[in-house]
From Swiss-Prot:
SUPFAM superfamilies: YrdC/RibB. The keyword Amino-acid biosynthesis does not apply. One of its GO terms (biological process) is riboflavin biosynthetic process. It comes from Shewanella sp. (strain ANA-3). Its cofactor is Mg(2+); Mn(2+). This is 3,4-dihydroxy-2-butanone 4-phosphate synthase. Mg(2+) 1 binds at residue 38. D-ribulose 5-phosphate binds at residues 37-38, 42, 150-154, 174. The keyword Metal-binding applies. Pathway: Cofactor biosynthesis; riboflavin biosynthesis; 2-hydroxy-3-oxobutyl phosphate from D-ribulose 5-phosphate: step 1/1.
Length: 217
């Protein structure tokens, strides 16, 4: 059903390309995962161009659990251990310990403080000692191999950033309805229309990446 509802937005390839262009322009994208999985839509921004206004939107329009998607090597470089030793969450979402910038924040909760924490973490020269633990930003470790390994929003986010030629770090939060329920695809499409954001799916990213591999082959 997801693919048929998204047909007006073009093919899977066209939807991904629209998303990549939006990210390059510093704008947000909406990514829906598989219907037999979480069946949720996440609002995603590139971490390197994230603004306070965008963070405020993530806090206001979404679940409030703002996550920073990072590749495995960055998680290791920052020495961020898993949030729990034995991950028993339904889809194995790889939360690390939460973080806060040690410098430049007050309580760490405001949009500006969360942006400062994210920019501190993704800096090329970032060190483990730059971050306090716990904090109000929740890093997620992406599986190597991206959506071809795990069809999650974490991997989809990192894949999109890399395909767009951006730093491999993205910020996401699940879109919610005004009554607090989770937004499904029809609501996600309406949200995208209201805020002029492209909508795509994890399946679209899988198709896009496989097409690139086929062309290389």
């Amino acid at each position: 059903m997801n693919q048929s509802l998204l047909a007006p937005f073009g093919t899977a390839i066209e939807r991904v390309e629209a998303g990549l262009e939006a990210l390059r322009q510093g704008q947000g994208v909406l990514v829906v995962d598989d219907e037999d999985r979480e069946n949720e839509g996440d609002l995603i921004f590139a971490a390197e161009s994230l603004t306070n206004a965008q963070m405020a939107m993530l806090i206001r329009e979404c679940s409030g659990i703002v996550c920073l998607c990072l590749p495995d090597e960055k998680v290791k470089a920052l020495e961020l251990p898993p949030m729990v030793e034995n991950n028993s969450s339904q889809y194995g979402t790889a939360f690390t310990v939460s973080i806060e910038a040690k410098v430049g924040v007050t309580t760490g909760v405001s949009a500006a403080d969360r942006v400062t924490t994210i920019k501190t973490a993704i800096a090329d020269n970032a060190k483990p000692s730059d971050l306090a633990r716990p904090g109000h930003v929740y890093p997620l470790r992406a599986q190597p191999g991206g959506v071809l390994t795990r069809r999650g929003h974490t991997e989809g986010t990192i894949d999109l950033m890399q395909l767009a030629g951006l730093k491999p770090a993205g910020v996401l939060c699940e879109v919610t309805n005004p009554d607090g329920t989770m937004a499904r695809l029809p609501e996600i499409i309406a949200f995208g229309a209201e805020h002029n954001m492209p909508v795509l799916t994890i399946e679209d990213i899988v198709i896009y990446r496989k097409s690139l591999l086929a062309n290389v082959g």
